[in-house]
């Protein structure tokens, strides 16, 4: 009896322990949907059926039991109201309205929703006594039912459309587990419509249902499965149904309804060997680095990839080995990949598991072993028949590595090679395949005197790169062959091997061009790239890589030390030693313009031309300036014909003019349009015809007459009434001319008075000076540019000739810059606020570097305009640039009255004078003046601007300057001058004119500098303390203006005629020819016009008849 009692007690305890399990049995049931949708209306009657929720069985015999959550929630899971409006039949899953809702119910929910109109609420439906708590709803044991509240009464039944009666507003989809008993998962009927509109008939028919595992009951319209589904056969179904709607007195309508069914997977397929292969063999030899994959085996599983959280628990892989060395050296990595397989013409998801045998540590080159490794794979959740365990076999052989070098290496090297130039590579056998092996290379020179190379080890391919380490040794004549011993050492085992190396030195050393940058990447244009060298250049010259011009591309245009190695998208061990070698691959700074950055550094792809400034740690990728040919062959033919026709017309017109000239009386000639600053030192002025031959001007054929008797033709377009002009104080004067400040009444139709400047001759001026003034008058009538001094008019009748030009408030640029130094070093940063005085008087604020660049840019724009007009200035300098209000630059000095704002600069002595320190080298030696010689002068002008009006070549007399320029000497970079600005100066001072930039390119470069300029110029720091730079007591105002002898200069004189003639200097070592390869007048023409008259506007003297004709054209 006691035993019976104790047995009964034990049974009771077991039953007590099983009670929770029995209570949880309905949890095997699951909802066929995770969300349901329905509408609720105001005054909808109580008892209205809303919808059915369905549960499917996980095992036979399970009976569903439904319950609702306690509260209604807002869409943001806000608890709004206790649920007493909607009830559910726990057995059938039917939800119905427990009470009618009115407008107050709507308002009550809206108030609890924070005053916002409420549109949607949801409640939770649970299966049985699920352990999920209120507010925690997760499929498959819980589903949400969303209700859209409509603040209106139920619509009239006749207003419904057929689709609204057939299917819910939101689509429906279903989830059914495989291998589960069949059951009902949906009911077609729209219950509220059926309840409130009984006269409307809605019937459904499942299409093509015979071949599918689904059926629809024609009476209750319930959709259920016919048999258990198998996901491995078909994973997705799309059911099609036909809905027929019929109402009283209405035609029958049919609507197609579709809804998807997804079959959920369970682990019912065992793992198998992919392709039936369960063994892999591997050899470990050159790849010995930790993480190296030794071998891979694949395992196929027809089930889907488990969730990441389940993967580690479900699939386990264990390395079975009693060898501790193997356990430490190898590990197994498991990676599942989803794949698709075909089953009954359907694509079904499956899983391919990759098991990789990986080195857990790096192996030395001396390690040698042979072993077999077994890996156990276990699918722990497998529920089907058979086994979920597999054994993978790996046969591994670890072989030792022997270091060997070739018998000997031989490379050439150019004597002009720059430092870090790559000469070649050394590499032990199979080094390209090495991984995890660390090799160090060293060079042992046979002679220390001729040791010019170094070696650096590449971390990528374990090779050694030979490079130039000492350029001085390469230049020694005795160093014709460099001999070394290459030693390769394994860092871990210290094993070594060696080979001989012979390097032959070739070529002849040529000195570097003056002003070349340290890095080839700085150069943006091909000519300056190929004439300079840079770090890493094997030939001593940079190489230009021309891009394909196809948008942002890896093949962008750039300047490189060697296109074989740079840029290649990879910053190697040698390039990383100095950023100047190949910043295109190694720069980590910002890249401006269209580009694609490399993974860690450099430019992967760029747009147009990419150039870099390593010192500033910036690169720029910008469109190429040069475009494709604008004119094809037909176009060129038409232009040639037009030019030929124009030439014939010109010849006929010239013949007619000459004939009229000899037929009629002489009239005063029209002055030259050349911007001359000093007549050629000859007995009479020389003019050049379009053919380039000399002919005497009218000065040599006419007697000298007084200025007063010189009759000037009136030009009605430009004539200004003399009585309306009131002259004021003198602004500046020379020996024969002066400029005064004046006011003009009703100038150009303006009301009131306008402040102007008036140019005029002094009483002692001759006809030659008058011709100069007339020359400037005729020239200014033809130019119109915001940065060229503007002509307003002239008083040419009934008195001396007066030219009325634009008034420049601040005088010459040189004086303006020097006065700015008196403001003092105080300045405000870009982030600070300016004081009130600088805001009221913006022209008086302290200069910034951006202002100085803006001055240079304005002048370059004006010179670009003059160059396009085929005009040569010949005296471009800061003293001849005027500063108008608003700090606007005005190019001036086109004739006699040049530099009258700088009183003592051009005071004419007994002889003419020329500005030596501003003149191009070909102008000094060959008396040749072109637009490119103006570019040279512009470079000196840049130097004046940056130094705030400093004197060029301070302390250097002109007689020394000639030899210095011939030997390549150029002014050094001022302290406050940026590298980019100084490079532009050096480009302007190129010895060959055709290698200097044109003004259009100069303007573009200055525009970019203006964009990048941000800092204010510190006048205290930027003003040099050297008194030579600004001391006028050294007569620098006179020194640069060299006297021109009045005697004729025969073209047979040597190129140093200025030195010999002016200073009586001679030197037997001076060359007899000019250092500039320019052709003289008796040879072939140069690439640029020698004077302005070689182009459109000429220094030509015309006959009176032709002058009259030109006056007619002008007016």
UniProtKB/Swiss-Prot annotation:
Residues 29-153 are annotated as: Cadherin-like region 1 (CLD1). Keywords: ATP-binding, Calcium, Cell adhesion, Cell membrane, Disulfide bond, Endosome, Glycoprotein, Kinase, Membrane, Metal-binding, Nucleotide-binding, Phosphoprotein, Receptor, Signal, Transferase, Transmembrane, Transmembrane helix, Tyrosine-protein kinase. SMART domains: TyrKc. The chain crosses the membrane at residues 638-658. Ca(2+) 1 binds at residues 178-179, 230, 232. Residues 168-273 form the Cadherin domain. Ca(2+) 3 binds at residues 267, 269, 301, 303, 379. ATP binds at residues 731-739, 759. Pfam families: Cadherin (PF00028), PK_Tyr_Ser-Thr (PF07714), RET_CLD1 (PF17756), RET_CLD3 (PF17812), RET_CLD4 (PF17813), RET_CRD (PF22540). It is an enzyme of class 2 (transferase). Its cofactor is Ca(2+). It is a single-pass type I membrane protein. It is found in: Cell membrane; Endosome membrane. PROSITE patterns: CADHERIN_2, PROTEIN_KINASE_ATP, PROTEIN_KINASE_DOM, PROTEIN_KINASE_TYR. Residues 725-1017 form the Protein kinase domain. Disulfide bonds join 137-142, 157-197, 166-243. Gene3D superfamilies: Cadherins (2.60.40.60), Phosphorylase Kinase, domain 1 (3.30.200.20), Transferase(Phosphotransferase) domain 1 (1.10.510.10). One of its GO terms (biological process) is positive regulation of DNA-templated transcription. Receptor tyrosine-protein kinase involved in numerous cellular mechanisms including cell proliferation, neuronal navigation, cell migration, and cell differentiation in response to glia cell line-derived growth family factors (GDNF, NRTN, ARTN, PSPN and GDF15). In contrast to most receptor tyrosine kinases, RET requires not only its cognate ligands but also coreceptors, for activation. This is Proto-oncogene tyrosine-protein kinase receptor Ret. The gene is Ret.
């Amino acid at each position: 009896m006691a035993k019976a009692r104790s047995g009964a007690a034990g049974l009771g305890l077991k039953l007590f322990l099983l009670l929770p399990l029995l209570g949880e049995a309905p949890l095997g049931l699951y909802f066929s949907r995770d969300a349901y949708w329905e509408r609720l209306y105001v005054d909808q009657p109580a008892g209205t059926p809303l919808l059915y929720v369905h549960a499917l069985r996980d095992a036979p015999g399970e009976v569903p039991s439904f319950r609702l959550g306690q509260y209604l929630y807002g869409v943001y899971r806000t608890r709004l109201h206790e649920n007493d409006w909607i009830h559910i039949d726990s057995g059938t899953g039917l939800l119905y309205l427990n009470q009618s809702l009115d407008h107050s119910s709507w308002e009550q929910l809206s108030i609890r929703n924070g005053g916002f109109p409420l549109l949607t609420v949801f409640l939770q439906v649970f299966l049985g006594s699920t352990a999920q708590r209120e507010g925690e709803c997760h499929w498959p044991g819980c589903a949400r039912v969303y209700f859209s509240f409509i603040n209106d009464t139920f619509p009239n039944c006749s207003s419904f459309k057929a689709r609204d009666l057939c299917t819910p507003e939101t689509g429906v989809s279903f989830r059914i587990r495989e291998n589960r008993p069949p059951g009902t998962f949906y009911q077609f009927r729209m219950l509220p419509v059926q309840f409130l509109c009984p006269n409307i008939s809605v019937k459904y028919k499942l299409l093509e249902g015979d071949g599918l595992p689904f059926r629809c009951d024609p009476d209750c319209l319930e959709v259920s499965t016919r048999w258990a589904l198998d996901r491995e056969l078909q994973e997705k179904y799309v059911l099609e149904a036909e809905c027929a709607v019929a109402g009283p007195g209405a035609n029958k309508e049919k609507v197609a309804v579709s809804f998807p069914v997804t079959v959920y997977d369970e682990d019912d397929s065992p793992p198998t060997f992919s392709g039936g292969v369960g063994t892999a063999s591997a050899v470990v030899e050159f790849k010995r680095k930790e993480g190296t994959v030794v071998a891979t085996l694949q395992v196929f599983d027809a089930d889907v990839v488990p969730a990441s959280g389940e993967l580690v628990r479900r699939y386990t892989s264990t390395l079975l080995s009693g060898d501790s060395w193997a356990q430490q050296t190898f590990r197994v990595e498991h990676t599942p990949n989803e794949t698709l397989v075909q089953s009954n013409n359907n694509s079904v998801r499956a899983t391919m598991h990759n098991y990789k045998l990986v080195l857990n540590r790096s192996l030395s080159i001396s390690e040698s072993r042979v072993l077999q490794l077994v890996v156990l794979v276990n699918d722990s959740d497998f529920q089907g028949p058979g086994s979920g365990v597999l054994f993978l076999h790996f046969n591994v052989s670890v072989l030792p590595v022997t270091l060997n070098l070739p018998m000997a290496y031989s490379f050439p090297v150019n004597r002009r090679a720059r430092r870090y130039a790559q000469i070649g590579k050394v590499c032990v056998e199979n080094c390209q395949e090495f991984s995890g092996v660390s090799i160090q290379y060293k060079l042992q020179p046979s002679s220390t005197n001729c040791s010019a190379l170094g070696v650096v080890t590449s971390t990528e391919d374990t090779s050694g790169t030979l490079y130039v380490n000492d350029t001085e040794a390469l230049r020694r004549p005795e160093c014709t062959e460099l001999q070394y011993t290459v030693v390769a050492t394994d860092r871990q085992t210290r094993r070594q091997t060696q080979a001989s190396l012979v390097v032959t030195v070739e070529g002849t050393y040529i000195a570097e061009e003056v002003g070349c940058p340290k890095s080839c990447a700085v150069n943006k244009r091909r000519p300056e790239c190929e004439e300079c060298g840079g770090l890493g250049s094997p030939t001593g010259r940079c190489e230009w890589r021309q891009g394909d011009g196809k948008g942002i591309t890896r093949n962008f245009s750039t300047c490189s030390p060697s296109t074989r190695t740079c840029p290649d998208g990879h910053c190697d061990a040698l390039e990383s030693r100095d950023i100047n070698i190949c910043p295109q691959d190694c720069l980590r700074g910002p890249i401006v313009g269209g580009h694609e950055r490399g993974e860690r550094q450099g430019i992967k792809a760029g747009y147009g031309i990419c150039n870099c400034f390593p010192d500033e740690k910036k690169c720029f990728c910008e469109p190429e300036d040069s475009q494709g040919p604008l004119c094809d062959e037909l176009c060129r033919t038409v232009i040639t014909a037009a030019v030929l026709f124009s030439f014939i017309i010109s010849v006929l017109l010239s013949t007619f003019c000459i004939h009229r000239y000899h037929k009629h009386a002489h009239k005063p000639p029209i002055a030259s349009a050349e911007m001359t600053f000093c007549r050629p030192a000859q007995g009479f002025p020389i003019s050049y015809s379009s053919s380039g031959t000399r002919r005497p001007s009218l000065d040599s054929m006419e007697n000298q007459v007084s200025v007063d008797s010189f009759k000037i033709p009136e030009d009605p377009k430009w004539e200004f009434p003399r009585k309306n002009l009131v002259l004021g104080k003198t602004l500046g004067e020379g020996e024969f001319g002066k400029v005064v400040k004046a006011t003009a009444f009703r100038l150009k139709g303006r009301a009131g008075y306008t402040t102007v400047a008036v140019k005029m001759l002094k009483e002692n001026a001759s006809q030659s000076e008058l011709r100069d003034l007339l020359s400037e008058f005729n020239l200014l009538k033809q130019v119109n540019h915001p940065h060229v001094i503007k002509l307003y008019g002239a008083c040419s009748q009934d008195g001396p000739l007066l030219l009325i030009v634009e008034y420049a408030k601040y005088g010459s640029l040189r004086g303006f810059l020097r006065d700015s130094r008196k403001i003092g070093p105080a300045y405000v940063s870009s982030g600070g606020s300016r004081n009130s005085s600088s805001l009221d008087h913006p022209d008086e604020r302290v200069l910034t570097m951006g202002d100085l660049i803006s001055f240079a840019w304005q002048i370059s724009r004006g010179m670009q305009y003059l160059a396009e007009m085929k005009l040569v200035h010949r005296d471009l300098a800061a003293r001849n640039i005027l500063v108008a209000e608003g700090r606007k630059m005005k190019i001036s000095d086109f004739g006699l009255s040049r530099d009258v704002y700088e009183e003592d600069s051009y005071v004419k002595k007994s002889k003419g004078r020329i500005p030596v320190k501003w003149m191009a080298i070909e102008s000094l030696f060959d008396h040749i003046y072109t637009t490119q010689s103006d570019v040279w002068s512009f470079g000196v002008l840049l130097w004046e601007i940056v130094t705030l009006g400093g004197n060029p070549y301070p302390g250097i007399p002109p007689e020394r300057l000639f030899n210095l320029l011939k030997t390549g000497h150029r002014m050094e970079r001022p302290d406050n001058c940026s590298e980019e600005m100084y490079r532009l100066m050096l480009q302007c001072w190129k010895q060959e004119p055709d290698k200097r930039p044109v003004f259009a390119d100069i303007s573009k470069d200055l525009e970019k500098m203006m964009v990048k300029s941000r800092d204010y110029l510190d006048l205290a720091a930027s003003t040099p303390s050297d008194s030579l730079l600004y001391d006028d007591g050294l007569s620098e105002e006179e020194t640069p203006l060299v006297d021109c002898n009045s005697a004729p200069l025969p073209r047979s004189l040597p190129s140093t005629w200025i030195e010999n003639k002016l200073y009586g200097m001679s030197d037997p070592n001076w060359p007899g020819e000019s250092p500039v390869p320019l052709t003289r007048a008796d040879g072939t023409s140069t690439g640029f016009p020698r004077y302005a008259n070689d182009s459109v506007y000429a220094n030509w003297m015309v006959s009176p008849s032709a002058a009259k004709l030109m006056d007619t054209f002008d007016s």
